């Protein structure tokens, strides 16, 4: 009988000790898909041609009080003057052009395929005519520098403008010159931005 009582006592002590240790352990930190992870520009592991041309990206400029966004397929990633850069092309006719001219920074964000219809919408309407944030249903977030990215995105690249230059129609191949003439639209401006921050999910 005494042996049973001793055994039960030892078991209870071990059980209490085990529970006490677990109570003192720090909770495990979990990373969810809703949490941004900061990475280096060199760690952007994507096919840039596919990301722009096929999947599309969302270009945004401005601050929380006044901003605009548009879907883009013309662009690229690379290096200039020893800096990692994003290059984009925006027509002077686009409403976003005004925001690019007035602000020092811009962002480009990529989205999962399920948001394709949102990008289609954002590339087909103008912020002059309607509230594109409300119409798209996307959720703007703002970086420490005050620039817009989106909760639904899975890659966000924040850029500081380095250089801007309108494309020269006289230097274009004939086919491209005719394209601009037929569409009767403003020429595209090339913007090169230094990548200052990158986040992914």
Question: Where in this protein do the model-derived segments appear?
Answer:
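Bacterial N-terminal signal peptides that target proteins for export
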Residues: 1-7
């Amino acid at each position: 009988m005494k042996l049973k009582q001793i055994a039960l006592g030892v078991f209870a002590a071990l059980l209490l000790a085990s529970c006490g240790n677990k109570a003192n352990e720090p909770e495990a930190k979990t990373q969810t898909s809703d949490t941004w992870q900061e990475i280096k520009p060199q760690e952007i592991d994507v096919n840039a041609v596919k990301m722009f041309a096929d999947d599309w990206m969302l270009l945004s400029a401005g601050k929380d009080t006044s901003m605009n966004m548009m879907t883009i397929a013309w662009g690229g990633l690379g290096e200039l003057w020893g800096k990692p850069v994003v290059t984009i092309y925006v027509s002077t006719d686009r409403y976003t052009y005004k925001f690019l001219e007035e602000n020092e920074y811009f962002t480009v964000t990529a989205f999962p395929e399920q948001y394709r219809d949102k990008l289609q919408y954002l590339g087909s309407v103008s912020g002059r005519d309607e509230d594109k944030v409300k119409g798209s249903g996307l959720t703007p977030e703002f970086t420490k520098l005050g620039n817009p990215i989106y909760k639904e995105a899975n890659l966000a690249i924040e850029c500081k403008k380095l250089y801007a230059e309108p494309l020269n129609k006289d230097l274009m191949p004939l086919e491209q010159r005719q394209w601009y003439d037929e569409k009767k639209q403003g020429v595209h401006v090339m913007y090169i931005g230094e990548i200052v921050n990158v986040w992914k999910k």
